[in-house]
Amino acid sequence: MRTFLLSLLVTLTWSGCQPSDPALLHVDLPCSVRSLDVLGPEHVRFAGSNGWVGQTLDGGATWDMAQWMAPDGTHPSFRASGHSSNHWHAVGIASPAWIARTSTTSMAPEWTYHNTDSAMFLDAMVWMDGNRALVFGDATGGCFTLLITQDGGAHWERVPCDLLPAPWEGEAAFAASNGNLACQGDTVWIFTGGLASRCLRSVDAGRTWTSIDLPVVQGSSMTGVFSATFRNARHGWAMGGNWEVPEDNEGNLAVTNDGGTTWQMLAEGRGPGYRSSIVHHPTQPRSLVATGFDGLDVSFDGGHSWAHHSDSSHYVARFSPDGRTLWLAGAKRLTRLDWPLQ
């Protein structure tokens, strides 16, 4: 196993000419990034394509990056990640599927899961607490892939098929922003798309599941929910749309006020079009950000109305725990914006 390390070999661009402007940081990357984890006010990690991972401990002023090579000599394409009590974890999406972890501030990988099934495609990871997590993937052999760990990611087991809802014809999930898995305590939501788009909900940490049909656009391979965010166990938003018709802004944003039992459409024909990532502000309950390759949009009223902030292309958005910073990542770029956005 070889790991290539880079320290500070990134291009940093600061802008903001007036004191009232937001501090703006752009970082040029050697990879595409669809998964971001903000571990603290200044600590951010990303998981990217071709084995690339990186972190900053000082709010983006300096970066360490590494290109992880798996034991079989491949560089996994990482599109999902998350952190437990003592480790950060990255998920390689396709066959051979790999999961690796490293200590919270380290860059050296430990490989904890491997699967060579040619149909394997892992989409997202979510941590329920410091020891328990789920990884969701597309169906193989007529059964969704759901991996679970209860020891901080040291070991992973596949949940038996008879405990999961059966996939519908043409139903899958999107590894677009590590956004189609969400949790609040032991309540977990999985969002699917394609020919069918559903919410799969568990209230007992993944032991039993119920299926809820969604009112969002669906019926073709690149439609449905791409990302969801919950501010508590009852209130959440699910967003996506039609990747092939990104300007279509109907049927792409739904809200629940009862923990996912029912969903209603929001901002029909008035909000942004296709977006791959939606996140809520950690301290402002009605503030939302949605981003995608067509731009960045903001709502301050729970998603009923939206303002287009910029045409800047990103795949994933994450807030810092204190809500003072918004991090964005996409194709060979990473951006930091101060909140509130200007």
Labelled PLM ranges:
Residues M1-F4:
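Positively charged n-region of N-terminal signal peptides that target proteins for export
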Residues L8-D21:
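Bacterial Sec-dependent signal peptides at the C-terminal "C-region" and cleavage site
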